[in-house]
Swiss-Prot record:
Function: Catalyzes the conversion of 3-deoxy-D-arabino-heptulosonate 7-phosphate (DAHP) to dehydroquinate (DHQ).
Compartments where found: Cytoplasm
GO molecular function, one term: nucleotide binding
Gene Ontology BP terms: amino acid biosynthetic process; aromatic amino acid family biosynthetic process; chorismate biosynthetic process
Pfam families tied to this protein: DHQ_synthase (PF01761), DHQS_C (PF24621)
Keyword Oxidoreductase: no
Family recorded in the similarity comment: Belongs to the sugar phosphate cyclases superfamily. Dehydroquinate synthase family.
Pathway recorded for this protein: Metabolic intermediate biosynthesis; chorismate biosynthesis; chorismate from D-erythrose 4-phosphate and phosphoenolpyruvate: step 2/7
The protein's name in its UniProt record: 3-dehydroquinate synthase
Length: 346
């Protein structure tokens, strides 16, 4: 299966291939960027598929806490030592962290070289590997340092998901539920009514998410408008991740909690019915996802929103469901209304 990402620029257009990974032929050198966990499972298989002048691999530790500038510097040093040139290619083999970091390294190495994504987690296949967002975290927040830089291709292999722990798989389902809640009521019902243990159902879910994201990115590559909707749940999630030092929750788990918080705010504003709020929360719980987080200080939590990339002119932009299958972008919500919701999670 092939899904095209059309950005109205032949230098940026590319395709997402689902279960079509075969031999990969490149001009110049290739470096595969992976982590210690994924490398042990799949690096050898991927290296055997590559035909290039020279092939290298760079293995970094596994975990969101390593998604920082220091690790980018390490990756770049390995590329310089291997003498990669402008016609070289990086391959991201891993989850969302590897995708973000490899894309960022590719965008700044010698002012930009090609890269492709081979995502090995559900979260990366349905979201992180598609759309060209790259970057790292710092002490001020998540993904605050980065670039928009499109891959040359993305290869989503569902067989890679067989080795995922249940917790990792479920974290990816948070992003699937996000897409369905924002954009497609029928897709949401499909998720409710079908088992992801069925490989064909799972393939359909991945394809649908890629199609949704492809449509959004085609309209708004650099998040100046509709693409911000893909951050539903993330305004809250990024604060949760930062407060827990990226160690307590997987990204998708934090997103699930953020979705529930956003939904309570939407319900308070009359955008979402209590019935739909409960339906979405129960769907998250069905996939073993957390929906609560104990906020120790709602004022501190609220102030952290202003570090969010979407905040402008001292106003926080909230992405909220307007029923299931539709969305609302709001930057006019008064502080007390938000604090009321945050106090519900104390």
């Amino acid at each position: 299966m092939k899904i095209d990402i059309n950005l109205n620029d032949d230098n940026k257009n590319y395709s997402v291939f689902i279960d079509e990974l075969k031999n990969l032929k490149f001009k110049g050198k290739v470096a595969v960027i992976t982590n210690s966990k994924v490398g042990g499972l799949y690096l050898g298989e991927i290296l055997n598929l590559i035909d290039a002048d020279e092939i290298f691999s760079v293995c970094i530790p596994d975990g969101e806490q390593y998604k920082n500038l220091a690790m980018i510097e390490y990756i770049l040093e390995q590329l310089f030592v291997s003498r990669l040139e402008r016609n070289s290619t990086l391959i991201a083999l891993g989850g969302g962290v590897i995708s973000d970091m490899t894309g960022f390294a590719a965008s700044i190495y010698e002012r930009g070289i090609n890269f492709i994504n081979i995502p090995t987690t559900l979260l990366a296949q349905v979201d992180a590997s598609v759309g060209g967002k790259t970057g790292v975290n710092n002490k001020f927040g998540k993904n605050l340092i980065g670039t928009f830089y499109q891959p040359k291709a993305v290869y989503c292999e569902t067989k890679f998901l067989n080795s995922l722990p249940n917790r990792e798989f479920n974290a990816g389902m948070a992003e699937v539920i996000k897409m369905a809640t924002m954009f497609d009521k029928d897709f949401f019902k499909f998720i409710q009514d079908n088992s992801v243990e069925n490989s064909q159902i799972l393939k359909q879910i991945i394809a649908k998410c890629v199609e949704i994201k492809a449509g959004v990115v085609a309209k708004d590559e650099k998040e100046s408008g509709i693409r911000a909707v893909l951050n539903y749940g993330h305004t809250f999630a990024h604060v949760i991740e930062m407060q827990t030092n990226y160690k307590k929750f997987l990204h998708g788990e934090a997103v699930a909690i953020g979705i529930n918080m956003a939904n309570h705010l939407a319900c308070k504003l009359g955008l979402l019915s209590k019935k739909d709020l409960d339906i979405i929360e129960q769907t998250l719980i069905k996939f073993g996802l957390p929906t609560t987080y104990r906020i120790s200080d709602e004022e501190v939590f609220y102030d952290s929103f202003f570090l969010d990339k979407k905040s402008e002119n001292k106003k926080i932009k909230f992405i909220l469901p307007n029923g299931i299958g539709s969305y609302a972008l709001r930057n006019d919500i008064d502080k007390n209304s938000v604090l009321d919701i945050l106090r519900m999670f104390k």
